[in-house]
Amino acid sequence: MQSNDENIYFPANQYVNAGQYSPLQQSFSQNSQYDLFDGFAEFGFLEQVPATNMYSGSQSTQMEQNYLPNVNNSTRKRKAPGQNEQATVKRRQIGIEKWRLPSRSVVQPSADISDLRRPPISYVALCALACRNAPDMKITPAGVYAFVLHHWRYYRYANENWKNSVRHQLSSKEHFDEETFQPDPSNPTVRRKFYIVKNPNMIRQNLISDADFDFFRKDSRGIEFYQKMFAGQIGLPRSLFYQIIGNGIPFLAGPENSSMFYQLLGMGKVVGYLETRYFREHYRSEHAATEPKYEEDYANFTEKIPSNAENLMSYGAATERNFQKFDFTDEEIELFHLNISSYHSVQKTCKECNLPNWCTPSVGDVETYVFGRQVPMPVNTPVILQQFETVAEQEGIRNNPLEERKTTEDPRDISILEALA
């Protein structure tokens, strides 16, 4: 892992360094009018900024010259100037300044998904399971979308008509009650809806069919995974990742990429515009169901969201007091995705010890327990892992506090420590 102090803050046209990006790094041609897709409107996460095109100008950027296909403007619909200009302005930029997404028309998945089939689980069951795992068992449609994308890979590539089915089930009032709330107390004109499942203790009896149960038993994650869902022990995926990346580029959704996103943030690394070399398409199998349950309040991302990542609590949390900005090498990115179960096990270990930043393990922990490197214990290493080292030496255990990872049958989830043994 390398320190990267000098490359964190840079202009938009310097986000790409030659030879470092995957084929997903595509953007707009010189004259293309970029906009974000309407799906973000549901999050209240759009920031009103001046109507400027970050790639406008008489000369194309280095990114465009080296990496980008030409986008035929004649095939893209544009809003007429004048009264519709404000509607375009509202979709210029989302979230934190450096985190922008392209139009889906120019970012396409590279995976061969011809063998993917829709899981035979009803939409009402999907909604009920998402609701059961939400705080206070209240959920927004956007929360259901994130939950579905997080746990079932098919929907990351499917036509987004499935979201209409989700909204229909939530609003049918047959199985769900509706509750209005105000996400921003300073703006009473903006109101959104929570949905609450009726008779939450009867979800299995009332909303889960025999076909659903048959699917649960055959799922590679096992019936135990779904039993945790019924009990509300899975939780919802962390929202910032989905509001910035997961819902905008759905084929990059999932626990692996979400974990990478937050670890980078904790290392002081802001994922720049179209900088997707850190993320992978996990389409060959469902995730390993090793992720801990995160306890998050409902995110209130409005026009007042901080414009800088430094204002987020998790920014720099992985470096603690000895703050430096770090980055992952290409090899480390591959190891992170390959060994994601060990990363989640480190999180669980830290959570059990009530460490305040357990969601974002320290740089030293990732080096040692995820990448499997024998490095000196850094000053900022959590006390629990320092104590483990002492116990390990006494009992003859070597760098393996994470026994649960051995239960997996997927060789991709074996710790790099075991692989190198």
Curated annotation (Swiss-Prot):
Q: Name one GO cellular component term.
A: nucleus
Which PROSITE patterns does the protein's record reference?
A: FORK_HEAD_2 (PS00658), FORK_HEAD_3 (PS50039)
Gene3D superfamilies registered for this protein in UniProt:
Winged helix-like DNA-binding domain superfamily/Winged helix DNA-binding domain
Q: What is this protein called?
A: Forkhead box protein fkh-4
Keywords (A to Z) from UniProt: DNA-binding, Nucleus, Transcription
For the null mutant, the annotation states:
RNAi-mediated knockdown causes significant reduction in the expression of 21U-RNAs, upon simultaneous knockdown of fkh-3 and fkh-5.
What this protein is reported to do is described as:
Transcription factor. Regulates expression of a class of small RNAs, known as 21U-RNAs, perhaps acting redundantly with fkh-3 and fkh-5.
Is the Transcription keyword given for this protein?
Answer: yes
InterPro entries named in the record: Fork_head_dom, FOX_domain-containing, TF_fork_head_CS_2, WH-like_DNA-bd_sf, WH_DNA-bd_sf
The DNA-binding region ranges are 118-218
Q: What Pfam families has UniProt attached to this entry?
A: Forkhead
Where in the cell? Nucleus
Q: Record's superkingdom?
A: Eukaryota
Which BP terms from GO are recorded? Answer: anatomical structure morphogenesis; cell differentiation; regulation of transcription by RNA polymerase II
